[in-house]
Amino acid sequence: MLEGAVTHITEADIVLRIILATVLSSVVGIEREYHQKPAGLRTNVMVGLGSCLFTLVSIRAADIFPDMKAIDPTRIAAQIVTGIGFLGAGTILFEKDRSSVIGLTTAATLWVVAAVGTAIGMGLYLEAIVGTLMVFFTFLVLSKVVNEVRKRSTDHASHGDTAMEANK
């Protein structure tokens, strides 16, 4: 149990958290849907919303059962991480020739959306909003960096020994 933690939240807080979890996970889902990724809008919303609801239920359990000293809201959060790990694992696939793996970003995105939903469920709005912004930074900015690195790597590899000899 979290010693000294205030677990009582109002119905207005609950509604706000559910709506915010839906909105933030929708923002990520729309970006994924736009790029035609396997886990799009609905999947991301379900993961974010579900994580928020599981977190709210665990927090509210302390209000509903005040005499139970062993209720610890963080236990549900730990199980969310495990559950999303299984869901994410289902999105990771080997290419037919087994030369590469696909779906890692999709799995990681679901994991982060679950973290955002859990943070909102706990009332950690700043963390959830900044986390969502960092997802967008990753998709919009870092993906361009990755593409540039891959392009340069391919250019370098295509020159083979000629490039190596030029550097001698």
Predicted regions and their residues:
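Alpha-helical transmembrane segments and their membrane-interface boundaries
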Residues: M1-I76, G123, E148, A163-K168
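Residue-level signal for the membrane-embedded core of alpha-helical transmembrane segments
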Residues: T22, I84, A108, T132-L133
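Alpha-helical transmembrane segments of multi-pass membrane proteins
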Residues: S25, S51, T55, I59, ...
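C-terminal ends of transmembrane helices
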Residues: S26-K37, L87-S100, K144-N147
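Short hydrophobic alpha-helical membrane-embedded segments
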Residues: I80, I102-V112
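Hydrophobic, membrane-inserted alpha-helices
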Residues: L87, T109-G117
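Canonical alpha-helical transmembrane segment with a positive-inside/aromatic-interface signature
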Residues: R98-S99, L124-K168
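Transmembrane helix-loop junctions at the membrane interface of multipass transporters and ion channels
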Residues: A114-E127
